[in-house]
C-alpha cells in the first residue's frame, strides 16, 4: 500500500509532526512519500517532494471586517492548493493521503462534491485544533468536509473534543501529542547567557512562538509581584508581535535584572530542549487556547513542572496528572502565587511525569495508523 504524507507549514513544531508521520508509515512497511517544505533528516525509504502550496494569510487581530475578507481569500487559497496537490498526487497515485495538519488543507467554503473531485483519494490526517466553536451551517468551517466519502479516519490531540466531532466523522482517533526529545544542546549561546544572568535563581520560561495568546501580559504582570533575587524569567522564541509590542517587551526586560527576552527563532529542537532542561518551571498559561500542546510532553520528559490556564484541555490534563498548577488567565496575583508555590513548595512527582510522558509516546502512532489502515478499501 502506498501512503503520501502532506503538509505545507514551515514551523519547527509542524516539521516534527510531518516527518514523524512519514517515518512511522514507512517503518510500518508502507511505500511512503512526503510532500512538504523540508525533507532533511528523513529516512531513505521516504520519497520526498517539495510542496508547492501557497501559505494561508494570517488573520488580522481586532479588525473584524478585514478578518472576514482574509477568511474568504484563504478559502480560495485552500482550493487552489488542493488543485495543485491533485496534480502531484496523480503522479504518485497513493492508496492513502495523510495530512499532517487538516486544519490548513481542508476547504472552509465549497460544496462537498467539489472537494471530492479535487481529492479523489482515500484520506486521513490530524486535526490539530479540534475543539472548535459550535458549528453554524453556511459559516466557514473545515468540519463538514470530514463527512467526505473518502475520509477513513481523523486523528485529534484533544481528547475532550472527540464527542463533538463524531457528528462529522465516526472514526475519531486520539493521537499522542509527541515531541522531539533530542538531547539538549550544550553550546547554545542563549543557554550560556541564561546561566550567566540567572545566577542560581529559579528560572521560569515562556518558550516557542511569541505572541500575546501565549499569556505574555499575564506573565509581565506577575513578574513584579515576585522577588527579583529569587526568580528569573526567560521569554524565548520567534516573535509575531508588532514592532511596538516588541519594543515595549524589550523595554520591560531591560528595566529589570531578572529578565532575559530573546525574540529570535530557537534554532532547533535540541536548543529548545536545552532551555527546558535549564528551567525550573515552564510557563504555558495561554489565553483562550483550547488545544493540546506538546510542550507539556517535553516538560514531562524533562521532569519540569508547568503552569497553565485553568479549564481547557491543558488545564484539565495538568490537574488530572498532577504535573503542575493552573491559574486564571487574567489573575496576576493567582499566577504569581502559583509560581511561588511550584518553585518552593510543590514536591516533584516523578511518577506523574512518567505517566504523562508514557501517554504521549510516539510509538502509540503505530496503533492509530493501524486503525486507519483497517478502513482503507
Where in this protein do the model-derived segments appear?
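Short N-terminal targeting/anchoring amphipathic segment
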Residues: 4, 67-78, 84-108, 122-124
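Glycosyltransferase donor-sugar binding loop
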Residues: 40, 207, 232-247, 265
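Donor nucleotide-sugar binding/catalytic pocket of nucleotide-sugar-dependent glycosyltransferases
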Residues: 124-133, 140-191
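Conserved donor-binding/catalytic core segment of Leloir-type glycosyltransferases
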Residues: 194-214, 220-223, 233-235
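Nucleotide-activated donor-binding/catalytic signature segment of Leloir-type glycosyltransferases, i.e.
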Residues: 246-270, 274
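Acidic donor-binding loop of glycosyltransferase active sites
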Residues: 274-291
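Short hydrophobic beta-strand element within catalytic cores of glycosyltransferases
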Residues: 281-282, 305-309
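A charged, aromatic-enriched C-terminal amphipathic alpha-helix characteristic of glycosyltransferases
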Residues: 330, 343-376
Amino acid at each position: 500500500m502506498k501512503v503520501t504524507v502532506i503538509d505545507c507549514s514551515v514551523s519547527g513544531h509542524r516539521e516534527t509532526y510531518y516527518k514523524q508521520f512519514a517515518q512511522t508509515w514507512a517503518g510500518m512497511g508502507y511505500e511512503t512519500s512526503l510532500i512538504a517544505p523540508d525533507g532533511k533528516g528523513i529516512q531513505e525509504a521516504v520519497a520526498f517532494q517539495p510542496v508547492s502550496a501557497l501559505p494561508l494569510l494570517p488573520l488580522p487581530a481586532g479588525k473584524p471586517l478585514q478578518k472576514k475578507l482574509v477568511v474568504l481569500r484563504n478559502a480560495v487559497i485552500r482550493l487552489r492548493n488542493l488543485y495543485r496537490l491533485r496534480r502531484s498526487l496523480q503522479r504518485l497515485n497513493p492508496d492513502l493521503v495523510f495530512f499532517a495538519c487538516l486544519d490548513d488543507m481542508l476547504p472552509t467554503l465549497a460544496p462537498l462534491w467539489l472537494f471530492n473531485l479535487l481529492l479523489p483519494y482515500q484520506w486521513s490526517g490530524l486535526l490539530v485544533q479540534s475543539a472548535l466553536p459550535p458549528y453554524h451551517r453556511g459559516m466557514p468551517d473545515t468540519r463538514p468536509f470530514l463527512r467526505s466519502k473518502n475520509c477513513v479516519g481523523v486523528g485529534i490531540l484533544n481528547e475532550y473534543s472527540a464527542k463533538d466531532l463524531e457528528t462529522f466523522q465516526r472514526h475519531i482517533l486520539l493521537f499522542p501529542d509527541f515531541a522531539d526529545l533530542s538531547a539538549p544542546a550544550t553550546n547554545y549561546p542563549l543557554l550560556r547567557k541564561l546561566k550567566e544572568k540567572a545566577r542560581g535563581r529559579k528560572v521560569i520560561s515562556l518558550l516557542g512562538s511569541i505572541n500575546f495568546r501565549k499569556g505574555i501580559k499575564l506573565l509581565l504582570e506577575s513578574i513584579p509581584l515576585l522577588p527579583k533575587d529569587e526568580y528569573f524569567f526567560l521569554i524565548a522564541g520567534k516573535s509575531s508581535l508588532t514592532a511596538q509590542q516588541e519594543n515595549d517587551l524589550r523595554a520591560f526586560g531591560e528595566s529589570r535584572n531578572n529578565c532575559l527576552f530573546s525574540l529570535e527563532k530557537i534554532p532547533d529542537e535540541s536548543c529548545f530542549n536545552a532551555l527546558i532542561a535549564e528551567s525550573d518551571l515552564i510557563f504555558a498559561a495561554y489565553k483562550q487556547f483550547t488545544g493540546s500542546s506538546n510542550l507539556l510532553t517535553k516538560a514531562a520528559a524533562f521532569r519540569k513542572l508547568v503552569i497553565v490556564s485553568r479549564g481547557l484541555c491543558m488545564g484539565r490534563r495538568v490537574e488530572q496528572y498532577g504535573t503542575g498548577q493552573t491559574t486564571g488567565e487574567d489573575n496576576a496575583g493567582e499566577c504569581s502565587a502559583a509560581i511561588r508555590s511550584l518553585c518552593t513548595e510543590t514536591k516533584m512527582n516523578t511518577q506523574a511525569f512518567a505517566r504523562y510522558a508514557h501517554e504521549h509516546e510516539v510509538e502509540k502512532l503505530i496503533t492509530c495508523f493501524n486503525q486507519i489502515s483497517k478502513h482503507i478499501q
